[in-house]
Protein backbone atom coordinates (compact mmCIF):
# COMPACT_ATOMS: atom_id res chain seq x y z
CA UNK A 1 0.00 0.00 0.00
CA UNK A 2 2.82 2.42 0.80
CA UNK A 3 4.40 1.74 -2.57
CA UNK A 4 1.18 2.72 -4.35
CA UNK A 5 0.85 5.88 -2.25
CA UNK A 6 4.48 6.83 -2.91
CA UNK A 7 4.05 6.29 -6.64
CA UNK A 8 0.91 8.46 -6.65
CA UNK A 9 2.69 11.26 -4.79
CA UNK A 10 5.62 11.03 -7.19
CA UNK A 11 3.31 11.31 -10.21
CA UNK A 12 1.53 14.27 -8.63
CA UNK A 13 4.86 16.04 -8.03
CA UNK A 14 5.91 15.47 -11.65
CA UNK A 15 2.61 16.90 -12.86
CA UNK A 16 3.02 19.98 -10.65
CA UNK A 17 6.59 20.51 -11.91
CA UNK A 18 5.42 20.35 -15.54
CA UNK A 19 2.59 22.79 -14.84
CA UNK A 20 4.98 25.22 -13.14
CA UNK A 21 7.31 25.02 -16.15
CA UNK A 22 4.44 25.75 -18.58
CA UNK A 23 3.28 28.73 -16.51
CA UNK A 24 6.83 30.11 -16.41
CA UNK A 25 7.13 29.70 -20.18
CA UNK A 26 3.81 31.50 -20.80
CA UNK A 27 4.83 34.33 -18.48
CA UNK A 28 8.12 34.66 -20.36
CA UNK A 29 6.23 35.01 -23.64
CA UNK A 30 3.75 37.49 -22.13
CA UNK A 31 6.50 39.71 -20.71
CA UNK A 32 8.34 39.65 -24.05
CA UNK A 33 5.18 40.71 -25.92
CA UNK A 34 4.35 43.34 -23.31
CA UNK A 35 7.86 44.79 -23.48
CA UNK A 36 7.78 44.93 -27.28
CA UNK A 37 4.33 46.51 -27.27
CA UNK A 38 5.43 49.18 -24.79
CA UNK A 39 8.57 50.02 -26.76
CA UNK A 40 6.79 50.15 -30.12
CA UNK A 41 3.83 52.24 -28.92
CA UNK A 42 6.18 54.65 -27.15
CA UNK A 43 8.26 55.00 -30.33
CA UNK A 44 5.10 55.54 -32.41
CA UNK A 45 3.77 58.23 -30.06
CA UNK A 46 7.19 59.94 -29.87
CA UNK A 47 7.48 59.95 -33.65
CA UNK A 48 10.68 57.89 -33.69
CA UNK A 49 8.99 54.93 -35.40
CA UNK A 50 7.79 54.92 -38.98
CA UNK A 51 4.02 55.38 -39.14
CA UNK A 52 2.40 53.90 -42.26
CA UNK A 53 0.00 56.04 -44.25
CA UNK A 54 -3.75 55.62 -43.80
CA UNK A 55 -5.32 52.77 -45.78
CA UNK A 56 -7.91 53.40 -48.46
CA UNK A 57 -10.45 50.95 -47.05
CA UNK A 58 -12.14 51.51 -43.68
CA UNK A 59 -12.09 49.02 -40.85
CA UNK A 60 -9.52 47.58 -38.55
CA UNK A 61 -6.40 46.28 -40.33
CA UNK A 62 -5.94 42.52 -40.58
CA UNK A 63 -2.36 42.23 -41.82
CA UNK A 64 -1.24 40.98 -38.41
CA UNK A 65 -3.40 37.87 -38.93
CA UNK A 66 -1.42 36.83 -42.02
CA UNK A 67 1.90 35.11 -41.42
CA UNK A 68 3.58 36.48 -44.55
CA UNK A 69 2.61 40.08 -43.81
CA UNK A 70 3.57 39.88 -40.16
CA UNK A 71 6.93 38.21 -40.79
CA UNK A 72 7.84 40.65 -43.57
CA UNK A 73 6.81 43.91 -41.89
CA UNK A 74 7.34 43.28 -38.16
CA UNK A 75 10.19 45.06 -36.40
CA UNK A 76 12.30 43.85 -33.50
CA UNK A 77 12.43 46.63 -30.88
CA UNK A 78 15.17 45.04 -28.72
CA UNK A 79 18.60 43.58 -29.39
CA UNK A 80 18.25 40.74 -26.90
CA UNK A 81 15.54 39.14 -24.77
CA UNK A 82 16.96 36.57 -22.34
CA UNK A 83 15.09 33.30 -21.98
CA UNK A 84 13.12 33.56 -25.23
CA UNK A 85 13.52 31.36 -28.29
CA UNK A 86 13.22 34.42 -30.55
CA UNK A 87 13.24 38.16 -30.08
CA UNK A 88 9.85 39.80 -29.59
CA UNK A 89 8.35 41.53 -32.63
CA UNK A 90 5.80 44.23 -33.30
CA UNK A 91 3.87 45.37 -36.35
CA UNK A 92 2.34 48.83 -36.82
CA UNK A 93 -0.64 49.11 -39.18
CA UNK A 94 -2.58 52.23 -40.07
CA UNK A 95 -6.29 52.20 -39.35
CA UNK A 96 -8.93 54.44 -40.92
CA UNK A 97 -11.87 55.22 -38.65
CA UNK A 98 -14.76 56.52 -40.76
CA UNK A 99 -16.59 58.04 -37.80
CA UNK A 100 -13.52 60.14 -36.94
CA UNK A 101 -12.06 61.46 -40.22
CA UNK A 102 -9.64 63.88 -38.51
CA UNK A 103 -8.07 61.12 -36.43
CA UNK A 104 -4.94 59.15 -37.32
CA UNK A 105 -5.18 55.66 -35.86
CA UNK A 106 -2.87 52.66 -35.66
CA UNK A 107 -3.04 49.09 -34.46
CA UNK A 108 0.22 47.89 -32.91
CA UNK A 109 0.50 44.11 -32.60
CA UNK A 110 3.28 42.48 -30.57
CA UNK A 111 4.33 38.85 -30.40
CA UNK A 112 6.53 37.46 -27.65
CA UNK A 113 8.08 34.01 -27.35
CA UNK A 114 8.77 31.65 -24.48
CA UNK A 115 11.57 29.11 -24.28
CA UNK A 116 10.47 27.57 -27.60
CA UNK A 117 8.77 28.93 -30.72
CA UNK A 118 5.46 27.26 -29.90
CA UNK A 119 4.90 29.28 -26.75
CA UNK A 120 3.69 32.68 -27.96
CA UNK A 121 1.80 35.59 -26.50
CA UNK A 122 0.07 38.18 -28.67
CA UNK A 123 -0.91 41.65 -27.47
CA UNK A 124 -2.32 44.70 -29.24
CA UNK A 125 -2.65 48.40 -28.66
CA UNK A 126 -4.88 50.78 -30.56
CA UNK A 127 -3.38 54.26 -30.74
CA UNK A 128 -5.53 57.18 -31.93
CA UNK A 129 -4.12 60.67 -32.53
CA UNK A 130 -6.73 63.41 -32.73
CA UNK A 131 -5.49 66.97 -32.47
CA UNK A 132 -3.15 67.06 -29.48
CA UNK A 133 -4.85 64.12 -27.77
CA UNK A 134 -3.56 60.54 -27.85
CA UNK A 135 -5.86 57.63 -26.96
CA UNK A 136 -4.44 54.22 -26.07
CA UNK A 137 -6.44 51.02 -25.82
CA UNK A 138 -4.84 47.69 -24.89
CA UNK A 139 -6.06 44.15 -25.57
CA UNK A 140 -4.81 40.59 -25.47
CA UNK A 141 -5.17 38.41 -28.55
CA UNK A 142 -6.68 35.18 -27.22
CA UNK A 143 -5.94 32.82 -30.12
CA UNK A 144 -2.80 32.79 -32.23
CA UNK A 145 -3.67 34.07 -35.71
CA UNK A 146 -1.32 31.65 -37.46
What is the predicted role of each segment?
Residues 1-146:
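Terminal alpha-helical segments
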Amino acid sequence: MMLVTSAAWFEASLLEARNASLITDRLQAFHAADGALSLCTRALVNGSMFAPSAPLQPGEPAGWRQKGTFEAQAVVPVVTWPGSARLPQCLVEAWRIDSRPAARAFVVTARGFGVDDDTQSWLQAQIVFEGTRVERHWRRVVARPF
